[in-house]
Design a protein with these regions (language model features):
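Short beta-strand->loop
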Residues: 79-82, 128-131, 149-153, 172, ...
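Short, well-structured alpha-helical segments in soluble
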Residues: 43-47, 113-121
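Bacterial Sec-type N-terminal signal peptides, specifically the leucine/valine-rich hydrophobic h-region
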Residues: 17-20
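A short, structured surface patch at a secondary-structure boundary
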Residues: 64-118, 126
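Solvent-exposed loop/turn segments at secondary-structure junctions
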Residues: 62-65, 83-86, 126-136, 153-157, ...
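Bacterial Sec-exported substrate-binding components of ABC uptake systems
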Residues: 6-9, 22-66, 173-207
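Charged, glycine-enriched surface loops/patches
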Residues: 136-173
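Loop/turn elements at helix/coil->beta-strand transitions in domains of secreted/extracellular proteins
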Residues: 54, 74-77, 123-126, 143-146, ...
Length: 209
């Protein structure tokens, strides 16, 4: 049951990003940056002073795609998780924005670790982290890179995180619209939940030597 709930959450997330990003994104669209420093309360309750974002690192998956959907392009992305690049190649985003394929995917590890000095040297001015990465947040703060933490372990936290990243980008209205798209996608998928639970499940035997 828990697996099905998580699968539904992420299926709805993927669907919302695909539809919302596709209808609101163009390669030539110019991002609108916040006019001044804003105070953001992230998912952990931390209050973060966030200057206008120009080049950001996005550690969690699939949040580089969320930033793309909110901003309309990849212009303010600077460093992404390697998994985000793997998801980009051969999929719809590759056809929509060639700049995404040029982003750095080495300064963030597969295990979500960060190379703080490399990020600073690359001109990264802000970062999105998972909610448990307090040590990484402190490390980046010490070198002048503010961070916000997000979480998508539940529908409520996911939608709050949309708004947090939207505020970070100065795209609060877009974040609210993305939440509406997500609600629609989630409702569409959960409408078939009973059918999925009743369906015959394959039995798989794992052998280990």
């Amino acid at each position: 049951m828990k697996y099905i709930q998580k699968a539904i959450l992420f299926a709805a997330l993927a669907g919302a990003i695909a539809v919302f990003g596709g209808c609101g994104s163009t390669e030539n669209q110019q991002p609108v940056t916040p006019a001044k420093t804003v105070t953001i309360t992230d998912i952990t309750g931390r209050q973060v002073e966030m200057p206008a974002v120009k080049k950001m690192a996005v550690v969690p998956l699939p949040w580089a795609s969320v930033v793309y959907a909110l901003d309309g392009n990849a212009d303010r992305l600077g460093a992404i998780h390697p998994g985000a690049m793997s998801a980009y190649k051969g999929h719809f985003l590759e056809k929509m924005d060639s700049h995404f394929g040029q982003l750095d995917a080495k300064m963030i590890g597969q295990d979500f670790s960060i190379h703080a000095e490399s990020l600073a040297n690359a001109g990264i001015d802000s970062a999105v982290l998972w909610n448990y990465q307090e040590k990484d947040a402190d490390k980046l703060k010490q070198i002048g890179i503010p961070t916000v933490m997000i979480n998508n372990d539940s529908v409520d936290n996911l939608k709050k995180s949309f708004l947090i990243v939207g505020q970070m980008l100065g795209k609060e209205d877009r974040a609210k619209q993305l939440n509406a798209y997500y609600d629609h996608a989630y409702s569409e998928i959960t409408a078939h939940k009973a059918e999925v639970e009743k369906a015959d499940k394959p039995t798989i035997l794992f052998l280990k030597n």
